[in-house]
Curated annotation (Swiss-Prot):
Catalyzes the thiamine diphosphate-dependent decarboxylation of 2-oxoglutarate and the subsequent addition of the resulting succinic semialdehyde-thiamine pyrophosphate anion to isochorismate to yield 2-succinyl-5-enolpyruvyl-6-hydroxy-3-cyclohexene-1-carboxylate (SEPHCHC). Its EC number is 2.2.1.9. The keyword Glycoprotein does not apply. GO terms for biological process: menaquinone biosynthetic process. It catalyses: isochorismate + 2-oxoglutarate + H(+) = 5-enolpyruvoyl-6-hydroxy-2-succinyl-cyclohex-3-ene-1-carboxylate + CO2. Belongs to the TPP enzyme family. MenD subfamily. InterPro entries: MenaQ_synth_MenD (IPR004433), THDP-binding (IPR029061), Thiamin_PyroP_enz_TPP-bd_dom (IPR012001). The keyword Membrane does not apply. This is 2-succinyl-5-enolpyruvyl-6-hydroxy-3-cyclohexene-1-carboxylate synthase. Keywords: Magnesium, Manganese, Menaquinone biosynthesis, Metal-binding, Thiamine pyrophosphate, Transferase. It comes from Bacteroides fragilis (strain ATCC 25285 / DSM 2151 / CCUG 4856 / JCM 11019 / LMG 10263 / NCTC 9343 / Onslow / VPI 2553 / EN-2). Gene3D superfamilies: 3.40.50.970, TPP-binding domain (3.40.50.1220).
Length: 555
């Protein structure tokens, strides 16, 4: 029988799955549940060493002899610090060593309780990875614990070998051994390239070919990659391809971009029918909350993430099984002719549903202003989308392939969008258009204080007197008082600041003015000065128009 502590069961199951089966056990009470579970499992070879200073070096010897990782487990407090010399040796000798420390619950650290000190991160730069496991009480705790353990154990041999530290808080009662077996756990595997000399990837290709419902999601990518026709033809028919404007030209063929609206329009039965079996992602952040929610609630059987750095990105909460550390385009071209030569129906099902969705034809609003700009953009320009409403509403409209799209989606904050766009435009010869909301603009208005902008800069400022996006958040009902603070209501205009900084200023109050101003704003020839078009709308009306459009999608 094993410990009833779920984080310990996850730990032991994943040590076994990742091939860490030689373990040095040090005495103690707080680590007794871990020791009992490890020692009681037939797949582990355990060694008892009393002195932690010696135990750490003993574990290094075990790892060196066979070339496979070894682990050392100690109790809480200064017992952990006694492993420090061995960890330093493992780090500089590049030995795969797992340090497992039992710990008191976080609430009891620095409270004069016995054998307590701040253990998470105690080895700092001398370990390749340090994780502090949660105690598991919810499904999210279990997912988080599993992910942290996979992250740590994968790092043992990632870009060279070295030690990792796993800290395990254990609450009392400590000695309840009621689990009859280890749980089935999700194991994440990393392929460092698809190289037969590095790892046999035949099994990976077999798994790829066994699925019929395959989805490819491309996140933000600040580049253009043109696939050769021979690759495009093979890849495009095999997957349902999804990307947003931020993905730019990085997809073989024509991707589905209105998937966020499609998911809203689908009935629950249709959503069930369209669940993918395999999702492969590459690129950066995905804007659509609806897609992320859909795949978290309806997880695929597998999620593979392809990236040059090999990071563990478990975006769909527990679906990640495989990390492929290589250039995503190299990966695509590698698998193109390893796929079974068939034409699955799944991609066409998505395409047929999405092409039937009505295009937005909206009355005067901040959404229609964005649409007017996108439809009139000159070829080969750059479009900078600020965060919050701007980047989301732009997704409602089709965008020419020749337009390069930029956005600060690393952290998705409203600060700095204007400064980033102006910096980009300063080093660019093409026309640069910026779409930005009022809060983001005024928060970053000192971007115009800099003198590094020219006539290739044109800013569409959407001013509806506050944070309109907060009006559309489901479940948020605001009183008059909270409304003022949450949405940051204001009556500010950019006119004086724009004119003082040398911009041509255009004020728009209705649809007729918008049509007229847009002609000047989007003309491909350079003007004598940069332009700010400030479009004033009513935030309550904007929210109502947006809701009406989504209601239309349902019918």
């Amino acid at each position: 029988m094993y410990s009833d502590k779920k984080n310990i069961l996850q730990l032991v199951a994943l040590l076994r799955a990742h091939g860490v089966t030689k373990v040095v056990l040090c005495p103690g009470s707080r680590n007794a549940p871990i020791v009992h579970t490890l020692a009681g499992h037939p797949d582990f070879t355990c060694y008892s060493v009393t002195d932690e200073r010696s135990a750490g070096f003993f574990a290094i010897g075990l790892a060196l002899q066979g070339g496979t990782p070894a682990a050392v487990c100690c109790t809480s407090g200064t017992a952990l610090l006694n492993l420090h010399p061995a960890i330093a040796e493992a780090y500089y000798q590049k030995v795969s060593l797992v340090v497992i420390s039992a710990d008191r619950p976080a609430a009891w650290i620095n409270q004069m309780d016995g054998q307590t000190l701040p253990q998470p991160g105690v080895f700092r730069s001398l370990v390749k990875k340090s994780v502090d496991l949660p105690e598991i009480h919810t499904d999210e705790d279990e997912w988080y614990c599993n992910r942290l353990l996979n992250e740590a154990l994968l790092e043992l041999n990632h870009h060279g070998k070295g030690p990792v530290h796993i800290n395990v808080p254990v609450s009392e009662p400590l000695f309840q051994f009621t689990a009859e077996s280890l749980p089935e756990v999700r194991v994440i595997t990393r392929y460092q390239g698809l190289n037969v000399y590095d790892r046999d990837y035949d099994g990976l290709i077999d798994r790829l070919n066994k699925y019929n419902r395959r989805m490819m999601i491309v996140g933000q990518m600040n580049l253009i990659y043109l696939f050769e026709k021979k690759y495009s033809k093979m890849l495009y028919k095999q997957f349902a391809w999804f990307t947003e404007h931020l993905g730019n030209q990085t997809v073989p063929g024509i991707p589905i971009r209105n998937f966020d609206a499609a998911l809203y329009a689908m009935s629950p039965e249709m959503q069930e029918k369209m669940i993918p079996e395999l999702v492969i992602t590459y690129g950066g952040h995905i804007v659509s909350k609806r897609m992320k929610k859909y795949l978290r609630q309806h997880p695929p059987k597998e999620h593979w993430h392809v990236s040059p750095d090999g990071e563990v990105i478990d975006l769909f909460q527990g679906a990640l099984t495989t990390i492929i550390e290589m250039d995503p385009f190299e990966f695509m071209e590698k698998i193109a002719f390893l796929l079974d030569n068939r034409t699955p129906e799944y991609p066409r099902q998505w395409e047929n549903f999405c092409k039937e969705l009505p295009r937005p034809e909206l009355p005067y609003s901040e959404m229609s202003a964005i649409g007017s700009l996108i439809q009139a953009l000159p070829a080969s320009c750059a479009l900078h989308l600020a965060n919050s409403s701007a980047v989301r509403y732009a997704q409602l409209y089709s965008l020419p392939d020749t337009v390069e799209v930029c956005c600060n989606r690393g952290t998705s904050g409203i600060e700095g969008s204007l400064s980033t766009a102006i910096g980009y435009a300063a080093a660019s010869k093409k026309l640069n258009f910026v779409v930005i909301g009022d809060l983001s603009f005024f928060y970053d208005m000192n971007a115009l204080w800099n003198n590094h902008f020219g006539s290739n800069l044109r800013i569409l400022l959407l001013n509806n007197g506050g944070g309109e996006i907060f009006h559309t958040l489901p479940g948020l009902e605001m009183s008059g008082t909270s409304h003022r603070f949450v949405t940051a209501v204001h009556k500010t205009s950019a006119k004086g600041w724009a004119e003082e900084r040398g911009f041509l200023y255009q004020e728009v109050q209705d649809e007729k003015q918008l049509d007229e101003a847009m002609k000047t704003f989007t003309q491909p020839e350079l003007l004598t000065q940069p332009v700010i078009m400030e479009v004033f709308t009513n935030k309550n009306k904007d929210a109502r128009i947006l809701k009406d459009y989504y209601h239309q999608l349902k019918n």
